[in-house]
Amino acid sequence: MTIQVAFIQIIQALSPIHGDREAASIAHILMEHITGLGKMDRIVYKDRELTEDQADRFQKGLDALLRNEPVQYVTGTGWFYGMELQVTPDVLIPRPETEELAEWIIEDVKKAGKQPGNQETGLEMQGRILDTGKRIVTGLHPSILDIGTGSGAIPLAIKKNLPSAAVSAIDISAGALEVAKANAKKLSLDVNFSLVDVLDVNATAALPIFDIIVSNPPYICEQERAGMQEQVLDYEPNIALFVPDHDPLRFYRRIGELAQEKLAPGGGLYFEINEAYGAETVKLLEEQGYVEVVLKQDLFGKDRMVKAKKL
């Protein structure tokens, strides 16, 4: 079987399920994974025969796709903010909307670092902190915590683009943390990962103070299951997706409470949110005492992100 024949077979098999365009996109991803060749090279070498191993991986991959398994789980990889990450069924597949959340933080920190008065050295800042007994958010060397990190996509994107930041991340899933640590090692990025249940007050008590806390927590209500894609329900970890219908903001409430204890004065709290609860999330944070609460839409025009400032 040649590269071109294999590519066409994938499209023909998947088009009735996903449509021609999505089927072609999936075919490109799988064939690059199998052959190690980019799109242009696969065109040049379209008549090259697959090796026995490649043909076996092709058939296993196609069988998995026909079971509606996401191509990212089939290949074991997904892309986020220009980084190729390992993904397994222990973690959610990274999504473009979450890239926007990471970018918001990166841009804000870079802007803060350019403000007048923020050009002091790390030693000068450390001395000023010791003198006053308070943390000062300057944007130079922020300490950042990601809650519910999954594959580590958010903290790794932040660390890659803000190398002087001290970045930590927590998750309730040991399996997810294994994936996140593997991604950090592969990318040679220094992020501190810990097994912590954010809903457990005792477990979070030992966390230090941070300049920024970010989270993309579970936010899909159980009643929304009916409108979701089957492959998400069948393959992605439900623990990272769903919240009870009677308490859709449970994680935002808890993380907001935690951030009042663990955020430095002037620190920032960033969330990805359920588009149906934008106004409610803003109201919750304002009631918790946060100021400068901003609701932001994603590229699709949906309420998707919120940031707030601790006094």
Features from the language model and the residues they span:
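Non-catalytic accessory regions of SAM-dependent methyltransferases
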Residues: 1-43, 47-50
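Conserved Class I SAM-dependent methyltransferase catalytic core
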Residues: 245-309
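Mobile active-site "lid"/loop adjacent to the S-adenosyl-L-methionine
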Residues: 219-250
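Conserved SAM/SAH cofactor-binding pocket of Class I
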Residues: 100-133, 137-227, 254
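Short loop/edge segments at beta-strand edges and connector loops
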Residues: 75, 195-196, 273, 297
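Conserved AdoMet
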Residues: 31-108
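Active-site beta-alpha loop architecture of Rossmann-like, nucleotide-cofactor-dependent enzymes
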Residues: 72, 220-223, 276
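Residue-level signal for inorganic ion chemistry
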Residues: 30, 68, 98, 154, ...
